[in-house]
Structure formats: C-alpha cells, structure tokens
Amino acid sequence: MRKQIDFSNLILKKTPNQYLCLPKGFNSLSKPHQLTSNYDVSARDLQSAWYKTVIKHRSVNCIFNDENSLKSEFTQLSRVFKFIDIISVEFIEKSHNLSSLAIYSRSVLGYYDFNVNRKRVIYWLKIFNRETKLLIK
C-alpha cells in the first residue's frame, strides 16, 4: 500500500504537473492553487458521494478508499500518451454535517502536463457539485 498524502505537510514540487485544492483556512505548508467549498454533509457521506461521481469517468481507478482515515486515492490515464496520474483526496469533517475536501492531482512522469491536472480537478468539482446537488456553504 502506498503512503497516503499528509496534506498539512505536503510540499509541492517545483514542476507545473500538479494541482492542489484545499479548504479555506486549512493549515498546510503549501499554498493551494484553488480553495474548495464546504458541504452540508458529513465527511464520510462526502467521501461516498465523491467516489460515486469520480469512478464513472474515463480510465479512473480507485486504488485506495478508507472510511476510517477519510482518504481516497485514484489513478487516471492521460488521454493521449496513457501516462498515469494520481489523485489523492482527503475528506475533512469541519463540524457536524459540515465537511470539505483536499485534492492533490499530479503526474507520475514528465515535467509538463498541459494543465491536465488542473483541468481534471476543476472538471471533477464542477460535475460533483452539479450531480450531487449538495448544499454548498
């Protein structure tokens, strides 16, 4: 089993082939590229809804999904060259029925990714918000 990402201590590489999203106010060594929203649902329910939405996408596989740690990890093959990208997600319980998520998407190979990781995360969040219709605060 791969070591799971510790979002608080994550230090981004000096390469452009990665994309990090964190909840507002999340304490991390790295500055996120984007902030994530809050959802009116428990972190466990958010994890379940995220899994159901993301797993339907082209060449996505779940390689880790743990309800105790509230962490999941997915892989997706790039469209053109079939390189593997890794997407780590942590579901964060902010209070009773209020949660958010941290996402780190990155390429395994190469230096440039033509913004694939950024586009993926933005798209997944857009689809997730549209499909789940969870109230966002």
Give the positions of each predicted feature.
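Ser/Thr-rich, low-complexity intrinsically disordered terminal regions
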Residues: M1-K137
